[in-house]
Amino acid sequence: MDGEADFMRRALELAEFGRGRVMPNLPVGCVLVRDGEIVAEGWHDHIGGLHAEQMAIAEAEVRGVPTLGTTAYITLEPCNHFGRTPPCTEALLWAGVSHVVIGAADPNPTVRGGGTETLRSGGVNVEEGLLVDECEEQMHEFMHWCRTRRPHVLLKAAIDAHGRIDGDPALPAERFSSEASLGLVHELRADSMAILVGINTVIRDNPSLTVRGPDIGPRDSPLRVVIDPNCRVPGDSVPMVYCAVATLMVHCTDLGAIDDVPHVVRMLL
């Protein structure tokens, strides 16, 4: 590799290893560089696990590679608060990293800039904005939330050659999806916080609405949400009897009777 952009691209590749496993956190990658060579790599692997910077520093320690004076290329501004793990800024300062190159600033306006300020106060040279578009694209769903305060919604539909989403309602439901498309569906589910369907889908297909295939680690499975205005959900349907994954049932027999319809709409959309 040669050039800063290549180091950041490698960090972006590493971040993808945490895709679907770190929710509600963001996928982050980090490489430590000395004399133009990567000496350690890290990524946020699973919820509650080491963050990317912490993993890279830990890898360097295991390999006996000194971190003092290294440069860290990180796809996202290092965190500066205690959560499930200590702050990444603290880890970088402890490791003696002298130069930090950040792809994207933290999109959360309540904490944005705190990480860079702490590092600079600790004597670290900080650069921002390297491959910022690519780094922001990697977390575009969260960027959408921070900018609009609305969830990022992905519509999925299995459609046959005639444009239908179902066959003859008098016959058992048919599956239009191929194995390849089903695999993609579960990858998308793994990268989501909720899976929403209408009551007719539950009655017709009796779906599990779970992630099957991708390893999402110890994070919570996506919440199952069923829009069932008139309480028609079958008591023996999978969303009702399979309790290993939480299900939110949305009932309302008369929307006109609700005093705060706009609030309900905001909560759903």
PLM features: residue spans?
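Short, basic/aromatic recognition patches
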Residues: 3-23, 145
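Short beta-strand scaffold segments in enzyme catalytic cores
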Residues: 28-36, 157-158
